[in-house]
Curated annotation (Swiss-Prot):
Its membrane topology: Multi-pass membrane protein
Main location class: mitochondrion
An example Gene Ontology CC term for this record: mitochondrion
The name this protein goes by in its record: Surfeit locus protein 1-like
Subcellular location: Mitochondrion inner membrane
Keywords: Membrane, Mitochondrion, Mitochondrion inner membrane, Transmembrane, Transmembrane helix
UniProt record similarity statement: Belongs to the SURF1 (TC 3.D.4.8) family.
Reported function: May be involved in the biogenesis of the COX complex.
Organism from which the protein derives: Arabidopsis thaliana
Pfam families named among the record's database cross-references: SURF1 (PF02104)
């Protein structure tokens, strides 16, 4: 009997030990499953807010790059200016005897007859001149053209003429011929002219000033030759950031300031300024070198990189729009967009951009807007 009871107790003890061991072995598996569930939850993508925000960001970048691409095509607005300049410059030069109604001339060439007063010439610069292999530093020589007495085809009032580009030796020789006394006298005359013209408020002073101009011309007729100048009416230059300030008292002129130049020569501030031009350059003529007519239309070609920049920015914009659209389509359809239509859209837009750029290939150039005189938009039918 005792043996039977002992056997029963042993079986109960062994069963309890087995149950405890099985429960302890199941604990790591439960912990592993909980870890896997937490990893899956953490790796699951947050829904729509992130995708919607990324799509808006791509759209913003797309609009920005498209705007940058359009800035390189802004010069197409200058087509009318280019056409009007070409038409005006191709016309036959007209005789200009008066300084009235200059705004109606545009870029039409004019012919002015008079006498050069080379003693009052002023050199503006330095101005570089591009050669075939290098560049040379020189100056623009500005000389007053005085009226011819008793000549009906002559100018009625003095004008300033930019005769063209000359080497630096011309200015050095001019200063040497003047000498120290000449420089002081020229500075005094400049200051005297400024004081005289600034005080021209009354009718008597204006009459006295106009009365003195013909006397100067008559004294110089015997030692001057009659000349005809063909050029374009221009205005003052806009100085750059690094351009030095003009010092009329020291005869130092770094940019074209027409009113100040006229005052320094003893004329009024409203004196007309003409830039001499040529169509066929005479090779036997050395200096001054007038400005080529073609340079009045286009002064400097823009590099080919601008075309590449336009294609680059528009292509970047197109890529951003496609990326943003694909994100929205995935959000709405919950599947990747496939098929032929998404491929045809970027190809068609790319073809449109390329054809647009090719049509504007002749307009990628800098328009000469510095020193432009009068009106550039001109109805040639109204020009007489």
């Amino acid at each position: 009997m005792t043996k039977l009871v002992s056997k029963i107790f042993k079986r109960l003890i062994s069963q309890s030990q087995y149950m405890s061991s099985s429960t302890t072995s199941n604990l790591p598996a439960a912990s592993q499953t909980s870890n896997l569930e937490s990893q899956l939850l953490s790796s699951a993508p947050p829904p729509a807010k992130k995708k919607r925000g990324s799509a808006l960001l791509w759209y913003l970048v797309g609009f920005t790059t498209y705007g940058l691409g359009e800035t390189y095509k802004f010069l197409q607005t200058q087509v009318e200016h280019l056409d009007s300049r070409k038409q005006c410059l191709e016309m036959k030069p007209m005789k200009l005897n008066t300084t009235k109604d200059l705004d109606g001339l545009g870029f039409r060439r004019v012919v002015c007859k008079g006498i050069f007063d080379e003693q009052r010439s002023i050199y503006v610069g330095p101005k570089p001149r591009s050669m075939s292999k290098s560049s040379e530093i020189g100056f623009y020589v500005i000389t007053p053209l005085l009226p011819i007495p008793n000549e009906p085809n002559s100018m009625k009032s003095p004008i300033l003429v930019n005769r063209g580009w000359v080497p630096s030796d011309w200015k050095e020789n001019s200063l040497e011929s003047l000498g120290t006394g000449g420089l002081v006298a020229a500075a005094k005359e400049s200051r005297k002219a400024n004081k005289l013209l600034s005080s021209q408020q009354s009718l008597l002073s204006k009459f006295w000033y106009k009365l003195n101009n013909p006397m100067i011309v008559e004294d110089q007729v015997s030692r001057a030759m009659h000349v005809e100048v063909v050029g374009v009416v221009r205005k003052s230059e806009t100085p750059g950031i690094y351009t030095l300030v003009n010092y009329p008292s020291s005869l130092a002129w770094f940019y074209l300031d027409v009113p100040k130049l006229a005052l320094a020569m003893g004329f009024g501030e409203d004196t007309m300024y003409i830039e001499s031009t040529y169509t066929d350059m005479d090779e036997s003529r050395t200096y001054p070198v007038p400005r080529d007519v073609e340079n009045l239309t286009r002064s400097k070609d823009i590099p080919l990189d601008y075309h590449l920049y336009t294609v680059l920015w528009h292509w970047s914009s197109l890529t951003c729009f496609i990326k943003a659209s694909s994100i929205l389509m995935r959000r709405l359809t919950k599947s990747d967009p496939i098929g032929v239509e998404p491929i045809l859209i970027p190809i068609s837009i790319l073809v449109f951009i390329c054809t647009k750029i090719y049509s504007l290939r002749n307009l990628f150039c800098k328009i000469d807007t510095i020193g432009v005189g009068c009106v550039t938009k001109l109805d040639t039918g109204k020009v007489k």
